[in-house]
């Protein structure tokens, strides 16, 4: 599945030995129940593969590298492996990867230096509108650029260990810092562009991880990004992760939703 290949194959420059194994490489914690009502769990053939963000009753935003041939989603979940009466299951009627995302990169066994993963966004149209409740709510797109130094919250059910790919039952939250893009450009061999955000902790240990892709990055209370890619192992010191800079895509998101309502 291509979303796994992307995460595992990205190469880094100027990076020394990996940090020792940590029980929670993302350095996160159990999110307060129902505190992230826009969080979406994206599935392929009954397997959780990515995160997502509910934008309105009919649309979910996720990462383009999560592309597969069919999807289903769960809304309003807190426990990944348990049934919850308040959660809502929806099929996806159609997916809309950003036309500027280079899908051919997902076919490669290894990712070459200089590869450009810009435009890592995809919209999913739900087959049936979500019911808006206390635990299922959309979140608005940003209206202004985020500032480096902002405190951000990322969330998801991705791996909580760096190499053994251990998923949690509880939705995980982690606080990280928005950094200048130069911090990422120095350590990745792939391109870091202005449609990306760089976020993490330079000391390591706090990070998103495999299968968090497409989930929300909320900075100073505003949705500013979605998880794109990061180092292997996750939480590597000196290596922040890459997120898609959503304000650069407001027009595409709104136009796509309107034309395909």
From Swiss-Prot:
Q: What PROSITE patterns does this protein's entry cite?
A: TRYPSIN_DOM, TRYPSIN_HIS
Q: Which GO terms describe its biological process?
A: zymogen activation
Gene3D superfamilies attached here?
A: Trypsin-like serine proteases (2.40.10.10)
What Gene Ontology cellular component terms go with this record?
extracellular space
Sorted alphabetically, the keyword list is:
Disulfide bond, Glycoprotein, Hydrolase, Protease, Serine protease, Signal, Zymogen
Keyword Cytoplasm in record: no
One Gene Ontology term of the molecular function aspect: peptidase activity
Would you list which residues are glycosylated? 102
Q: Which residues form the propeptide?
A: 17-24
- Identify the stretch annotated as signal peptide in this record: 1-16
Q: What pairs make up the disulfide bonds?
A: 31-173, 50-66, 152-219, 184-198, 209-234
Ranges for domain Peptidase S1 come to: 25-258
Record-listed E.C. numbers: 3.4.21.119
**What does UniProt list as catalytic?**
65 (charge relay system), 120 (charge relay system), 213 (charge relay system)
Reaction(s) the record says it catalyses: Hydrolyzes mouse Ren2 protein (a species of prorenin present in the submandibular gland) on the carboxy side of the arginine residue at the Lys-Arg-|- pair in the N-terminus, to yield mature renin
List the CDD domains.
Tryp_SPc
Q: What's this protein's function?
A: Cleaves REN2 at a dibasic site to yield mature renin.
Give the UniProt family note: Belongs to the peptidase S1 family. Kallikrein subfamily.
Q: Which protein is depicted?
A: Epidermal growth factor-binding protein type B
The species is Mus musculus
Its taxonomic placement starts with:
Eukaryota, Metazoa, Chordata, Craniata, Vertebrata
